[in-house]
């Protein structure tokens, strides 16, 4: 899936040629990835994020928790992004569910999120990638126990069809509306002071830390002045 095709979809969406429906209706005038002031650490579309709500750069990471590339990214790239950019207020890092292979694991992560442990659960899934199979709710319950979650509430959430629907809608939104070709894929977005997108760059597939850093620097650089005669 070539970069140019992915970027073309993004440019059309920015130009308003693609309608931007989301899994849940948004308040007027906001974008789906903006922080929801009513839910700490969540966006308006319900995704979880790390970092300052007012960071000038937003990274959207489209993830499948059974993806070896995603696991490697979290281990080798995200760690450095967190130290150098997320923790310093430069980047807000949003995990967008794109579970082509493991939708049930995505449901489990959302259930952990209901108890304030989305990232801890997601990291357990990716760290132990070869230790669980998609659809094995017993394994998911085991990870919930490892995190000392309320196991009854977790089990009830796993059986909640609305959470399953949320995951299905997230996958459909990423595929149909954003044009995400695979997991992982990334959008790096420069936002204005209101949190709305000014510039968007799309990258299908894994992205080395050097490319993240280069794009963050370029998006932060002031625009080149237009020469005057």
Regions found by a protein language model. Name each.
Residues 46-47, 95, 129, 200:
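Generic secondary-structure boundary/loop-capping signal
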Residues 1, 55, 60-145, 181:
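Structural alpha/beta surface segment adjacent to cysteine/selenocysteine redox centers
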Residues 51-53:
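Short, flexible hinge/linker loops that cap or flank conserved catalytic cores
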Residues 1-46, 57-62, 72-78, 82-83, ...:
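C-terminal cap of thioredoxin/glutaredoxin-like
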